[in-house]
């Protein structure tokens, strides 16, 4: 389900006519070469298209207008090969409505001491041309990104690639539609928020639906469709009957698959890319969606439990940014406070994303007291090890805030035979005590998105693009 348009990024370089036509042709040739080699590097997830050498305010303004109305263009990359008077960039930059990357680089990565002359100096002026251009962006309070270094170096290309993913996620953020099945968990504070402001700032549309609307769609799913999904499930996961008799086990799994197909069809009909559930709102449903939710999250839908639409929308954005790679809905569940073992055990009742599994997930059926419904099927697995980030978004009186930190993710020290859920252990890199204290001081909630694929820098870049306050704990 996670499909993204074939976006591209338009690349322009700044100059001025006083250098002469031959020099401007040389500037264009160098810029085209950079674009070609960036594309050939295999590093960039989206194509860079060199458009032109920008020499006048009129050409820059017209270019930015063209960027805005081309839906296949996700953003702009600029470079000042020579000195480009920055007043020329004011109007166009103010009109730009898409992400902007200033690539502060130089065509050649060395100083040719034996051959350097004023012709070379006049043509290779990035050292001060990029400063002139950066000044006007700072003066205009543009939420742009600056990547500094030689364009041919892998670390610079990696930075551009990561920014491209953020820029695409920004564009796709304005297409995020969240279907709320039921309301938020009663009397919970942090899952609330200003939906109008969220649509203005991040583009997130949030709509409420009664459970009866969803149940009607679920009941339309045929046995034949469930049979097909059951066979697919058997091919991908380990089916564990456990203490259940065969008929009870199969029925429970089939109920979840019926929910999976019903929810998916409901979302597809409405163009929704994320959803929430709430164990307090289950009218007409045999089970709380567990396996159903996990399969939808696996497919790329954003998800939030207990009506948490902010985390659902954030999850969708992060899945786009990460190409749906090891990025999962999570909750801080319980703690290990022993000296030398400090850690958070993250989980949820049923809905943790199998993209972070380190082992082959098992389809199991167990009782769940919360919700008061029949025993739900769910995927049970252990999370992964490695560097990751944990991020949340909360709403305050003065706007939205993104809170996050880097973590060391690990597998639990032991088995949990009496806790048949998906689980992930982690410790904030700043330490559990510091991390937890600063998280709570910042007002971070208990629902988060954990990602092994994304970086703090990328999430900070996204927050900057949408004008969100940032509180990253370092």
Swiss-Prot record:
It comes from the Bacteria. The keyword Transcription does not apply. Keywords: Arabinose catabolism, Carbohydrate metabolism, Isomerase, Manganese, Metal-binding. Binds 1 Mn(2+) ion per subunit. GO terms for molecular function: L-arabinose isomerase activity; manganese ion binding. Pathway: Carbohydrate degradation; L-arabinose degradation via L-ribulose; D-xylulose 5-phosphate from L-arabinose (bacterial route): step 1/3. GO terms for biological process: L-arabinose catabolic process to xylulose 5-phosphate. It catalyses: beta-L-arabinopyranose = L-ribulose. Signal peptide: none annotated. Belongs to the arabinose isomerase family. Catalyzes the conversion of L-arabinose to L-ribulose. This is L-arabinose isomerase.
């Amino acid at each position: 389900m996670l499909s993204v348009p074939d976006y591209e990024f338009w690349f322009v370089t700044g100059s001025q006519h006083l250098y002469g036509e031959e020099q401007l042709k040389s500037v264009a040739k160098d810029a085209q070469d950079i674009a070609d080699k960036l594309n050939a590097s295999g590093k960039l997830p989206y194509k860079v298209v060199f458009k032109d050498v920008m020499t006048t305010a009129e050409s820059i303004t017209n270019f930015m207008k063209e960027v805005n109305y081309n839906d296949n263009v996700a953003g702009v990359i600029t470079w000042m090969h020579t000195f480009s008077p920055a007043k020329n960039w004011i109007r166009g930059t103010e009109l730009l409505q898409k992400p902007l990357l200033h690539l502060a680089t130089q065509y050649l990565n060395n100083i040719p001491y034996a051959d350097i002359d004023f012709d070379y100096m006049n043509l290779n002026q990035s050292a001060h041309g990029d400063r002139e251009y950066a000044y006007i962006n700072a003066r205009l309070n543009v939420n742009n990104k600056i990547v500094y270094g030689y364009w041919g170096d892998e670390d610079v290309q990696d930075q551009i690639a990561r920014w491209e993913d953020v820029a695409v996620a920004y564009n796709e953020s304005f297409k995020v539609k969240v279907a709320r099945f039921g309301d938020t968990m009663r009397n919970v504070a942090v899952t609330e928020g200003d939906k109008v402001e969220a649509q203005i700032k991040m583009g997130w549309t949030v709509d409420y639906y009664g459970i009866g609307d969803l149940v009607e769609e679920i009941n339309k799913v045929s046995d034949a469709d469930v049979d097909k999904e059951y066979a697919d499930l058997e091919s991908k996961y380990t089916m564990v009957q456990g203490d259940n008799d065969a008929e009870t086990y199969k029925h429970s799994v089939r109920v979840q698959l019926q929910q999976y197909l019903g929810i998916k069809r409901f979302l597809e009909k409405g163009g929704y890319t994320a959803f929430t559930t709430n164990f307090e709102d289950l009218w007409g449903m045999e089970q709380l969606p567990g396996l159903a939710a996990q399969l939808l999250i696996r497919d790329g839908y954003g998800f939030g439990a207990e009506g948490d639409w902010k985390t659902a929308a954030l999850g969708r954005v992060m899945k786009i940014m990460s190409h749906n790679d090891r990025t999962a809905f999570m909750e801080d569940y319980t703690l290990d406070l022993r000296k030398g073992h400090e850690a958070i055990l993250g989980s949820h009742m049923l809905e943790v994303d199998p993209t972070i599994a380190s082992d082959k997930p098992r389809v199991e059926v167990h009782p769940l007291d919360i919700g008061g419904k029949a025993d739900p099927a769910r995927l049970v697995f252990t999370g992964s090890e490695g560097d990751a980030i944990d991020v949340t978004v909360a709403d305050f009186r003065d706007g939205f805030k993104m809170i996050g930190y880097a973590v060391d993710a690990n597998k639990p020290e032991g088995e949990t035979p009496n806790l048949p859920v998906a689980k992930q252990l982690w410790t904030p890199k700043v330490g559990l005590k510091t991390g937890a204290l600063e998280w709570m001081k910042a007002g971070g909630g208990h629902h988060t998105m954990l990602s092994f694929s994304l970086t703090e820098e990328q999430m900070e870049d996204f927050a900057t693009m949408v004008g969100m306050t940032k509180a990253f704990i370092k």
